[in-house]
Amino acid sequence: MLKRHAYDQLLNWKNRKTKQGLLITGARQVGKTTLIEQFGADHYEHVAKVNFIEMPQAVETVSKAKDTEDLILRLSVLSGTEITPGKTLLFLDEMQACEDMLTWTKFLSGAKGLDVIVSGSLLGIDVFNVRSIPVGFLQTMRMYPLNFYEFCAACRLPQPALDTLRECYVDRREVPDYL
């Protein structure tokens, strides 16, 4: 996997223990899903993922939940993973397809103490259709395409070469042609 600066932001969110869910937005194809899945695999025993576009039946299933316990059971069935606070990352992908789910995150992350990450490429536009945005219960993060440094690292440019590039930029010198 590519080393992304956003990974460190995910780690900071996890370590802060604020009982806040994390909302990750960004353009399509910038690596949101891949990053979250890798983070979950690295730091949790289980990742319970529900993608509301790939699983259209999930929207109806979630909308019929009576309370938080019922919702957790439904999400567990949809993801095929037991959801346990402290051991499971609940990853709700393409949230723009299920407006009610954003409201539920308040209860999942706050009262139930679950680590919840919600993501979607069009979420920033569609979030305004939600009845009750959980103010104070969601930390937000915007993800961007690779920056230049991440790109160079992905191309396996050695650290001394990256340092040389940085020095050339700071000193406004020409970059050596071998770089």
Residue positions per predicted region:
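Conserved lysine of the Walker
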Residues: 32
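Hydrophobic positions on the alpha1 helix immediately C-terminal to the Walker A/P-loop
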Residues: 35, 39
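Short glycine-rich substrate-engagement loop in P-loop NTPases that contacts/grips substrate
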Residues: 54-86
